[in-house]
Every structure is written in C-alpha cells, then in structure tokens.
C-alpha cells in the first residue's frame, strides 16, 4: 500500500525506484509512519510483527529507507521445492508469474540476483534462513534468528503452531502444525514434467545443489 502511494507521488520523468532519491527525509519518515499505522489492524498491541508478503524482496531498498529498524529475513528453500510450491498454489490475487514453469523459474532467478545485490548494498542487514537446515537443526537456527533480531527466546518460538493468531497467507495451514520434512521433496514426484523450470533456473539450481 505504501509502495502504491509512493508510485502515485512520482515526480515527473521519474520512476520507482529512482524517484526515492528525490524524496525528502520527511516524506520517507511519513511513509514509514503510515505503514506502522496501517498495519496495526493486523498486529494489535504486539510490539513486533512479521510482514511476509512474497514480493517484499523487491522493495528492500524502500523498506530500509522508510523503516530503518526493520529486520530483513531472507527465507529460502531449494529452488525446485520453492518454485513447485508456488506453481501448485492458486493465489487469491496477483502472483501471475507462478502460473507457468518458465515464468516462475525466471522470477526465482531474478530474486536470487536481486538478493545478492541487497546483501552487497546493505551488508549485515539481511539474515538468510535455509529451510532445509531449519528442519534438521531447528532450535539453534531459531536462536540464531532471534539473535539477529535482538529478541529474547520464548517457548512460543518453537511452539508456534499453538498460536491462535491470524494468518493471512497461503501458509496458514502449515503454521498450525510443528515443522515437518514431508514437503521438502514433493517436487521430485513430478520431476519428469519440470524441465522448463530447471532450464529457467539455470545456474541458480546448480549453485543450490553445491551449497545445500
């Protein structure tokens, strides 16, 4: 919503994200204050909350400028698992790139390249969590994440599935149960049909096999 408002205020002959350099510190601060105010309906009185919209990675520069205290978490899965999960999910709106194997592979590759850029521009500001490591080394990974966020450990951090909080994303069912491994390799059952996805991922897929 803040992003849409920012686009409406674009200075003539300027486009997002270039226009950000022409906005005053006062305007940027107002964007941040507007975001905090408009998200209160979802977080209530909670001092911290998570905005996990899937396209947030595109706006990390904007987020950093209007919410300088925000913690950026880059949650990743194996590229094939991530893309297959998106491909089989019917989203309520948007995310049109998920409806084609080539398209979602290209989008994921662009995401990886952009995240590499953000990590160079904002060193130490992005904390990456690899799902495959999380499911096998859960509590140490949770503690590492809490350390990055400057938060104390609470039992609810590892018993998140007992929460009755509102979840407005496609993962609403997953967060109601303990972390599990069964979803990691679902894509392999359809491997013979995922050629266009593998081709679109290219080197990103190869590098993931090396690092995971």
Task: Please report, for each region that a protein language model flagged, where it lies by residue.
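PAPS-dependent sulfotransferases, especially Golgi type II membrane carbohydrate sulfotransferases
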Residues: 16-22, 26-46, 86-128, 136-209
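ATP/adenylate-binding site constellation spanning eukaryotic-like Ser/Thr protein kinases
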Residues: 4-6, 69, 123
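Short N-terminal helix/helix-N-cap motif within the alpha/beta-hydrolase-1
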Residues: 58-61, 84, 139
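Conserved phosphate-donor/acceptor-positioning beta-strand/loop module used by diverse small-molecule
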Residues: 63-85
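Short, solvent-exposed loop/turn segments at secondary-structure junctions
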Residues: 54-57, 78-81, 89, 132-136
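Structured core elements
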Residues: 49-51, 71-76, 127-131
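Flexible, glycine/threonine-enriched loop-and-boundary segments that flank and lead into catalytic domains
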Residues: 34-69, 120
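Single conserved hydrophobic/aromatic residue that forms the stacking wall/gate
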Residues: 1-7, 11, 210-211
């Amino acid at each position: 919503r803040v992003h849409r408002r920012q686009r409406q205020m674009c200075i003539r002959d300027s486009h997002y994200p270039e226009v950000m350099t022409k906005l005053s510190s006062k305007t940027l601060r107002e964007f941040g204050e507007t975001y905090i105010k408009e998200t209160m309906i979802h977080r209530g009185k909670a001092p911290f909350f998570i905005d996990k919209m899937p396209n947030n990675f595109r706006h990390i520069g904007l987020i950093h400028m209007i919410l300088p205290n925000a913690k950026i978490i880059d949650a990743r899965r194996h590229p094939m698992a991530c893309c297959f999960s998106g491909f089989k999910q019917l989203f309520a709106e948007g995310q049109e790139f998920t409806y084609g194997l080539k398209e979602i592979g290209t989008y994921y590759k662009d995401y990886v390249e952009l995240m590499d850029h953000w990590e160079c521009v904002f060193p130490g500001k992005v904390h990456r969590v690899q799902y495959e490591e999380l499911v096998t080394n859960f509590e140490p990974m949770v503690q590492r994440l809490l350390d990055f966020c400057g938060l104390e450990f609470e039992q609810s951090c590892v018993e998140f599935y007992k929460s009755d909080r509102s979840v407005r994303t496609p993962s609403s069912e997953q967060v109601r149960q303990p972390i599990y491994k069964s979803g990691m390799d679902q894509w392999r059952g359809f491997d013979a049909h995922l050629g266009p996805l593998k081709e679109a991922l290219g080197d990103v897929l190869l590098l993931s096999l090396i690092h995971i």
